[in-house]
Regions:
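N-terminal pre-ligand scaffold of iron-sulfur
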Residues: 27-114, 130, 151-167
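Cysteine-rich micro-motifs
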Residues: 117-127
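Short metal-binding segments enriched for Cys and/or His
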Residues: 128-141, 155
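Sec-dependent bacterial lipoprotein signal peptides
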Residues: 1-24
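Processing junctions and N-termini across compartments
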Residues: 18, 95, 116-119
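Short Gly/Pro-enriched turn/cap motifs at secondary-structure boundaries
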Residues: 143-146
Length: 167
């Protein structure tokens, strides 16, 4: 039997997808405590001002620190354990993660997004996470060694044009 370039390409793609699914099943994304998350960006004006609109854009939301400045937090606003990282994935869909590093499990030790490589890094332990393509999976460092992924939050489209971020 002869396998042409198309067959080989399909086989490699299927093999890669299978390996990624198997690897994702082994990752622990529950190290960060489950605390309330509710961020209302459902108003189109709020989304236009505070949302993310393209690959490489990001935003931090930390209610206790007043980040971003002048954001209209309400009594019903909750930004998780260490805050929220809002990014755009490779298909321009918004994704949200807790900012706390799952290795450190400390709300004051937060990951930082790097716009040059589209990954997030913990300045304390050095772990690197893929936040734009593989849903917060660890790429290197102690998080990779221990299979600790970032805690993901749901980003739900709103009827009014923006999004809501919830746990």
């Amino acid at each position: 039997m002869h396998f042409g370039p198309n067959h080989l390409s399909r086989f490699c793609s299927a093999l890669l997808a299978t390996l990624l699914m198997a690897a994702c099943g082994e990752v622990n994304d529950d190290r960060i405590p489950a605390v309330s998350v509710n961020l209302d960006l459902s108003n189109q004006g709020y989304w236009d001002l505070y949302g993310v609109h393209g690959l490489g854009q990001y935003r931090y939301f930390i209610r206790n620190a007043g980040i971003p400045a002048n954001f209209p937090y309400t009594a019903l606003s909750y930004t998780g354990f260490g805050g929220i990282l809002l990014v755009t994935d490779i298909s321009n869909s918004p994704l949200a993660y807790d900012l706390a590093c799952p290795v450190e499990v400390d709300p004051d030790v937060t990951i930082e997004f790097d716009t040059d490589n589209l990954r997030a890094r913990c300045p304390s332990c050095g772990s690197v996470y893929d936040v734009c393509e593989f849903e917060g999976s660890p790429v290197s460092g102690p998080a990779h060694d221990n299979k600790y992924a970032l805690r993901r939050y749901r980003v739900i489209p709103a009827a009014t044009g923006g999004y809501n971020i919830v746990f």
